[in-house]
């Protein structure tokens, strides 16, 4: 194995977020309010199963332990189950997760688990069916809830649920969410709304700091847990009276980037050192043949020397991120 991926600030990278499509069938207000529009960058289409196999093999050799498949909506790819199986071929990768809108969860989750999937994140921004419809543009609330139930039925011990925290939309619904997870092993993760190139007006209107929820959770006796090295950025809280957990993802908080442990590869094969970074490093020309792995690993390692200390979101920098489907959120 090559040496562990480490940047100039001594941060080690165990976690790859791999986008496999930027297509999505939902129209969430904070991401794709006008629906998916092809960007014109699909010169070769999205990464193939073989290309995904090669890029994840290289990252595994460089110390990656966890791969999250993202989009867009990953399950819209007809070969999604094959993609899971291809990533699973790497023994060094202990966790394979997906972030999904839950649209096909009920139908396909058993097949995904059989292929090697170990973790599921489902986006649910409201537990009110009408508000869910208003946020996503899809009247699929009951279908998504059935999908979460199906995940438990096929053997997943925990499901993570992502909720984008929005002022005057869902920030006042904490009690409703807590009731939902009291007897369910769901890690409910409130994610602060982030400003993107296309979402500045929405950000100004609806952003609220996750510190508001953190203060309330601590007041109610919730306990902050320690992070593991391949965990995502959430601050996780537990309570003895609840089967579920609460996670808070607060990218505007001081020192948020100090524990960064993840890199991103886009659906067209570009390595992004930060969700809000500039440009990206092309890897696709080194994904054509198995004999290119050493050169691929060298390019990834060299690129990491350019990773900045912080995302500079607090300075109103949004980089090239037009919307969160662009490189997988």
UniProtKB/Swiss-Prot annotation:
Residues 8-234 form the Radical SAM core domain. Binds 2 [4Fe-4S] clusters. Binds 1 [4Fe-4S] cluster coordinated with 3 cysteines and an exchangeable S-adenosyl-L-methionine and 1 [4Fe-4S] cluster coordinated with 3 cysteines and the GTP-derived substrate. Its cofactor is [4Fe-4S] cluster. [4Fe-4S] cluster 1 binds at residues 24, 28, 31. Its EC number is 4.1.99.22. Pathway: Cofactor biosynthesis; molybdopterin biosynthesis. This is GTP 3',8-cyclase.
């Amino acid at each position: 194995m090559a040496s562990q991926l480490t940047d100039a600030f001594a941060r080690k990278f165990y976690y790859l977020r791999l986008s496999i499509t930027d297509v999505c069938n939902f129209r969430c207000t904070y991401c794709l309010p006008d629906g998916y529009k092809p960007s014109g960058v699909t010169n070769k289409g999205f990464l193939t199963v073989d290309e995904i196999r090669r890029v994840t093999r290289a990252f595994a050799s460089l110390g990656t332990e966890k791969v999250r498949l993202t989009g867009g909506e990953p399950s819209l790819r007809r070969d999604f189950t094959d993609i899971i199986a291809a990533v699973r071929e790497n023994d060094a990768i202990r966790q394979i997760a997906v972030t999904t809108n839950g649209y096909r969860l009920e139908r396909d989750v058993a097949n995904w688990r059989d292929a090697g999937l170990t973790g599921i994140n489902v986006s649910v921004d409201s537990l009110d069916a009408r508000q869910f419809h208003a946020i996503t543009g899809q009247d699929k609330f009951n279908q998504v809830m059935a999908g979460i139930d199906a995940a438990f039925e096929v053997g997943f011990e925990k499901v993570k649920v992502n909720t984008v925290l929005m002022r005057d939309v869902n920030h006042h619904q904490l009690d409703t969410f807590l009731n939902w997870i009291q007897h369910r092993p769901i890690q409910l993760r409130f994610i602060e709304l982030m400003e993107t190139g296309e979402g500045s007006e929405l950000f100004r209107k609806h952003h609220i700091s996750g510190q508001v929820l953190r203060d309330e959770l601590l007041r109610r006796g919730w306990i902050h847990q320690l992070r593991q090295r391949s965990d995502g950025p959430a601050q996780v809280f537990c309570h003895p009276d609840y089967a579920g957990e609460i996670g808070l993802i607060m990218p505007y908080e001081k020192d948020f980037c100090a524990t960064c442990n993840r890199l991103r590869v886009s659906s067209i094969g570009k390595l992004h050192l930060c969700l809000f970074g500039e440009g990206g490093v092309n890897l696709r020309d080194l994904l054509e043949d198995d004999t290119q792995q050493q050169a691929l690993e060298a390019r990834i390692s060299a690129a990491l020397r350019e990773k900045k200390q912080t995302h500079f979101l607090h300075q109103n920098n949004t980089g090239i991120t037009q919307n969160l489907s662009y490189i997988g959120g």
